[in-house]
Amino acid sequence: MEFILSLIGSLLLIICVLVSVAFLTLLERKVLGYIQIRKGPNKVGLMGIPQPFCDAIKLFTKEQTYPLLSNYLSYYISPIFSLFLSLFVWMCMPFFVKLYSFNLGGLFFLCCTSLGVYTVMIAGWSSNSNYALLGGLRAVAQTISYEVSLALIGFKILLFSFL
């Protein structure tokens, strides 16, 4: 019974994260619209509120294309794996109701975020394009350099919280 409740809680958390990301992109589009002295997305529904759902439907119904010389399986699996990793990181966040409580949550967070580097590298490599590979390697180098500073800041916060 406890497993089913934690599974339902995890699915509810993932759905809430996806919906909040959709509405944050709507907020971003609205703010950018007002910066450019226009209203932003307002054609769908009341004040454009159903716009993220319409965008999701449009993205899921678009024709799937892939480069002719690409490695088909890794070309499609790497972005999906990246999405699952970014959603999996939310499981260790402490909320009012702890879904998964364990002592090494910070280390789990750093491990999951560092696995995202491999998805970018595989996505760049699997397209069999030199430009995509170079872009992927640049993104990997940038992500690794950001992870080092994130880990140092996190460890400093942990160190000073015990003093």
UniProtKB/Swiss-Prot annotation:
Record keyword Translocase present: yes
Function statement: Core subunit of the mitochondrial membrane respiratory chain NADH dehydrogenase (Complex I) that is believed to belong to the minimal assembly required for catalysis. Complex I functions in the transfer of electrons from NADH to the respiratory chain. The immediate electron acceptor for the enzyme is believed to be ubiquinone.
GO molecular function terms noted in the UniProt entry: NADH dehydrogenase (ubiquinone) activity
Protein name as annotated: NADH-ubiquinone oxidoreductase chain 1
Native source organism of the sequence: Drosophila pseudoobscura bogotana
Phylogenetic placement of the source organism: Eukaryota, Metazoa, Ecdysozoa, Arthropoda, Hexapoda
Location in the cell: Mitochondrion inner membrane
One GO CC annotation: mitochondrial inner membrane
Alphabetical GO biological process terms: aerobic respiration
Family: Belongs to the complex I subunit 1 family.
Catalysed transformations (reactions): a ubiquinone + NADH + 5 H(+)(in) = a ubiquinol + NAD(+) + 4 H(+)(out)
Membrane topology: Multi-pass membrane protein
EC numbers, comma separated: 7.1.1.2
Domain of life: Eukaryota
Coiled coil (UniProt feature): none
Transmembrane segments: 3-23, 77-97, 104-124, 143-163
The gene coding this protein: mt:ND1
Key words of the record: Electron transport, Membrane, Mitochondrion, Mitochondrion inner membrane, NAD, Respiratory chain, Translocase, Transmembrane, Transmembrane helix, Transport, Ubiquinone
